[in-house]
């Protein structure tokens, strides 16, 4: 699995969302590389890991990332949040958890109302086989919908989607299955790690209400909602997201991974 390493300081692992790659975090790299050693993951089937056939399943991917990185704070965006949360719940070397536009469960249920219908991800899966490019374009449009900087963010996501090669259909389908079926809420009450939950106020995929509900399940969690932010708030509101990550890590005890 390809992992770019840049910067200096405490270690921070960054895991991207569905269909993208580690380069999507460029705005955060620009702001954090002087203070953190950043480990930018390309998930299997994505970016420079396009030929990596590791199954896109939580234990396989988390194990591979953990084997290639030192003790660190793990930060996941969207789908990447599932890997980061699983790591924080199972690995002592994870010193803290940051979730950006990510929750332990992405689909709606009777006891989890503030999420998307399962049919949303099912439809993306069906359409991939008949209209690969159009399906990805529709998903990117959903990523930025509602954001105050939607046009600029959409241009950036389109560029990041193709600059390292398109993701594989296999990896995309496996990612959709994770989004449809994963429920990690049970791990939160006993997480035992500091956590930060960063939501976009206008996110159409992951409701800030759901993120606040998830944070409430984790003892001592911090929750932040970025005003006017969409599903990728680190693009249009990079200063705010970077500052939140800086403050979060700085507040950790040395044992947790603070400076």
From Swiss-Prot:
Q: What class of enzyme is it?
A: hydrolase
Q: Reaction(s) catalyzed by this protein?
A: 6-carboxyhexanoyl-[ACP] methyl ester + H2O = 6-carboxyhexanoyl-[ACP] + methanol + H(+)
Binding residues annotated for substrate, in chain numbering = 18, 78-79, 139-143, 231
Annotated pathway: Cofactor biosynthesis; biotin biosynthesis
What is the annotated localization of this protein? Cytoplasm
Give its E.C. classification number.
3.1.1.85
Keyword annotations of the record: Biotin biosynthesis, Cytoplasm, Hydrolase, Serine esterase
**Record GO biological process:** biotin biosynthetic process
Q: Quick one: where is this thing mainly located?
A: cytoplasm
Cellular component GO terms, alphabetical: cytoplasm
User: Which Pfam family is one of this chain's hits?
Assistant: Abhydrolase_1
Q: Which GO molecular function terms does the record list? A: pimelyl-[acyl-carrier protein] methyl ester esterase activity
Assembly: Monomer.
* Similarity-based family: Belongs to the AB hydrolase superfamily. Carboxylesterase BioH family.
Q: What does this protein do?
A: The physiological role of BioH is to remove the methyl group introduced by BioC when the pimeloyl moiety is complete. It allows to synthesize pimeloyl-ACP via the fatty acid synthetic pathway through the hydrolysis of the ester bonds of pimeloyl-ACP esters.
What is the protein named? Pimeloyl-[acyl-carrier protein] methyl ester esterase
According to its UniProt entry, this protein's organism is Stenotrophomonas maltophilia (strain K279a)
